[in-house]
Curated annotation (Swiss-Prot):
Binding site for Zn(2+) 1: 9, 12, 36, 39
Catalysed reactions listed for this entry: S-ubiquitinyl-[E2 ubiquitin-conjugating enzyme]-L-cysteine + [acceptor protein]-L-lysine = [E2 ubiquitin-conjugating enzyme]-L-cysteine + N(6)-ubiquitinyl-[acceptor protein]-L-lysine
Subunit structure: Interacts with DIO2. Interacts with SQLE.
Phenotype when changing residue 9 to A: Abolished auto-ubiquitination. Loss of ubiquitin ligase activity
Protein name (database record): E3 ubiquitin-protein ligase MARCHF6
Originating organism: Homo sapiens (Human)
Amino acid sequence: MDTAEEDICRVCRSEGTPEKPLYHPCVCTGSIKFIHQECLVQWLKHSRKEYCELCKHRFAFTPIYSPDMPSRLPIQDIFAGLVTSIGTAIRYWFHYTLVAFAWLGVVPLTACRIYKCLFTGSVSSLLTLPLDMLSTENLLADCLQGCFVVTCTLCAFISLVWLREQIVHGGAPIWLEHAAPPFNAAGHHQNEAPAGGNGAENVAADQPANPPAENAVVGENPDAQDDQAEEEEEDNEEEDDAGVEDAADANNGAQDDMNWNALEWDRAAEELTWERMLGLDGSLVFLEHVFWVVSLNTLFILVFAFCPYHIGHFSLVGLGFEEHVQASHFEGLITTIVGYILLAITLIICHGLATLVKFHRSRRLLGVCYIVVKVSLLVVVEIGVFPLICGWWLDICSLEMFDATLKDRELSFQSAPGTTMFLHWLVGMVYVFYFASFILLLREVLRPGVLWFLRNLNDPDFNPVQEMIHLPIYRHLRRFILSVIVFGSIVLLMLWLPIRIIKSVLPNFLPYNVMLYSDAPVSELSLELLLLQVVLPALLEQGHTRQWLKGLVRAWTVTAGYLLDLHSYLLGDQEENENSANQQVNNNQHARNNNAIPVVGEGLHAAHQAILQQGGPVGFQPYRRPLNFPLRIFLLIVFMCITLLIASLICLTLPVFAGRWLMSFWTGTAKIHELYTAACGLYVCWLTIRAVTVMVAWMPQGRRVIFQKVKEWSLMIMKTLIVAVLLAGVVPLLLGLLFELVIVAPLRVPLDQTPLFYPWQDWALGVLHAKIIAAITLMGPQWWLKTVIEQVYANGIRNIDLHYIVRKLAAPVISVLLLSLCVPYVIASGVVPLLGVTAEMQNLVHRRIYPFLLMVVVLMAILSFQVRQFKRLYEHIKNDKYLVGQRLVNYERKSGKQGSSPPPPQSSQE
């Protein structure tokens, strides 16, 4: 077998020839050591990599130039290449300027001017619209406002397309379909209610689609059968009107909807990329897209803003409510919402009339338009109105906590209505979000089926838009009212009542100090940055808080279960938990046997009816009902309310009290914002609970292990403190002081005044600058500082390497900062006076040397960059004119320099 000893190419498995010699360009050995240059180049083009995928060694090529190439390029060649590069740059600059002008100037400006023209309400504005388009008055403000208008129209367009997809794939409501509902596998109509009523209480929570937003708390069980009966009655009425032609039209319509995204649409989407659509590929096709975007903006402004606004405006004027709407400071928004409400009523009336006269295509079009308006209004109510109500109710119930009155809130609303409403909406959204998060935590602890009246947000079938499409409007209205009652009652229980108790028991504890000014000697900026950079990351980035809360909920549930004999109801039985896997398998098999796959005409309604026809609700576990079960449930609710009240009292008093006591050592008797005291108290409480939980976890391991762990943790804490002093103390202080000397002092302090430096402010700003520099470094290219920071992050606190951090990170950074601070000072204070200059010149040099040296460093960096760019241009010109090929460089093991030979010039690599 002589061929086994011959050198062959790793790709084509051929031997080397004088015309095609073999090379060994990387560290690989054995049968994959050698390769032809042509094979390697072909493989590199295919893989789009410049290194060996096995040994990670970068391949090197040496350029081959023409024999008549001079040692130095002639001036005329360099000048010609420079002119060509400048011409290419100018052409690209003109093109990208045109692109930016079109998308950032023409599109938003036309949108804003058309919007103002339509809402001016005069014919003269419509006639002068072409001249207004060319006007340069308020150009920047109109562009910014136009960007907002364009964003709204694009969001509306995307929402319409997405809503259409929801209707196509999820199925339209039953009342919108033309034909009679198809039969399911059991032989019943799709809209018939199930015969069995067992477990209706638990099934109803999983019954139709999940509630539309996070505020619908109360389930819809009592009216499930009524709703199905109403839908059945509607469908039976529609059956009398629909014929064979209608069924064919419905099937064809559904088929047309499914064929809307055909292959040609996919092919067109593949050809249209973002670069081509925006004009970043160098073509002028984007001008057509600009025209279509402007037309789309005009159409959407006219249809979705102009028409509803004027419908609402004429209606309010006719009813005499115009003055009340104007007094709300949100005339445009309220008028538009009223217009949409009237439009929805008009559409549903026209839909009914079209049904009576059997205009089936018009009937379907009117129904789809009604669904669009209905979903839009429900989204506004769920995401806008409900959090706003919660935010205002929270504010009203907490007025005594801040020593405020309703008159103060009215004055703040009159002075800044938009800001006030946004802040209250934001507070309400936070409240709703944390309430939903707490419900998710409860589901992890309690028995499946306990919270049957609450939505399961983790349900994979959860789709609020489908609920908005399918459920009638009165059910959404009822859910909204019940949710407002439930959320409002919780606010009364956990905020208003604890405040009343605190004021009666601790009269001097309230109100909280929330003034925007402070007479404390410590800078507000320092406290804010300390809060944002130290306290909040520790409280938010740790997963221990959720585990502690989950443990408290589990302990409370176990206690309440044994006290009230509701352990089986709350947590389930152990025997049932052991057999839960078998039950789940049986339930899944039962579900597969009963659930019919919905066809095109059925959609989501059939899926919901399939869920209803199961033997029990999804995820339900049976439980044992003790005697006097309703009374025990009532006592459980009372016990829960008392627990929530006590927990709220502790949360409102303990952190603030601890924070005030600790901050008094720092600020004395001066009053500061309660945000800082509460944050400080929460941080101390968190540290205390964390230490207690760690000690409790160590207790079962014995005294020797505890001493060993205490020793390890003490050593780790000492190392961490040293690193914190260097990296979180010295480095930010030097960085903030350097920023003060280079930027702040020359800009803010005149030459005839002496700048004052505040170490706390400099340190706080330095912390912010250090985090920004670290983030930019980690996002940038690979260099020694990024490598060191990544290594420190990878080690973490438990494996902290003090020697590595001091030697590789702290010492170099501190040395550079000290040199940046000391060298200019030595020059200004030690060298300049020896030159015999005047005192004014010495003061000028002393105050301006830091920004001057910064400018020198920046100019040197720019000059170095330009030199590198000129070298690249020189190589590019030389390669374009004299390069005839490239030769692969062999890897030499014995020579480190050859083994790590640098890659060829970028312009010559292929």
